């Protein structure tokens, strides 16, 4: 990695990490989660968010274009750690209902990671005067916040249903 000596370089570095996160989610993580999930409402929510995530990738790629940079993803140990933890635990969960609850929690953790990253990048983009980029990142942020609301609602419903059995 080259030395980072100015805010713009730091911003591009953060974008590379976020591109990795969104690509990994769209290509691998969300489709796998959708296959795992039994609850139809939750499954549909993940399917919809997969499509949103593909748009997030396009928005980040557009951001690179606006900056005159090549969109190169940079590995995110944060998302890889969440995925590894999920894989470690999920194989030990015997009940489909409990697995859905666990998957909802895993999805919420990922949304929090994405929300924090987008908020940080928006602050930097605003400081750099990159208004068009701010708009693209805010679009992604708004969808991540909405996805978090949905997954929290699903998690609450799943816990209530499982506890009532």
State the predicted function of each range.
Residues 1-165:
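Amphipathic alpha-helical hairpins
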